[in-house]
Amino acid sequence: MYQIYTDRFCNGDPSNDVLTNEYCYIGEPVHRVEDWGRYPAQMDVREFYGGDLQGVLDKMDYLQELGVEVIYFNPLFVSPSNHKYDIQDYDYIDPHLGKIVSDEGELLPDGQRENRFASRYIDRVTNKANLEASNEMFAQVVAEAHRRGMRVILDGVFNHCGSFNKWMDR
């Protein structure tokens, strides 16, 4: 079994990377990490390395050469953290890990901490085209894994979600 923490695995599609100041998480702006060799920050749940499902597809030969029989994915659903355990939407794969086909809106202005102004993030993670394309990307990963005789386990954490989600009436 090979566990994949997708954000830290392989960046196969830089166009879907979380951008610095795209939104705030736990009161501070998120940050895109350029140097994969850099030591992680203390509050590194706000740091994104850009690994994605395209990167997993790109490394399927490598995984097969290792003799991987099962790929165990950390959560992949829409979530503001890099670990994805605080899920916003269980229906869709996070477009930052999948595919972004619509990329409208603005980054947060310097000093702004309110995500209602994070229009680029809102578009990226709520636009139906992005969400559907991301689910399709995951289906491609699963199909390719199965074609190679590998099985896929998804860490679904269905017993809890993040506080920023579509079910809370605020």
Where are these regions (language model features)?
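N-terminal structural segment of carbohydrate-active enzymes
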Residues: 1-151, 159-169
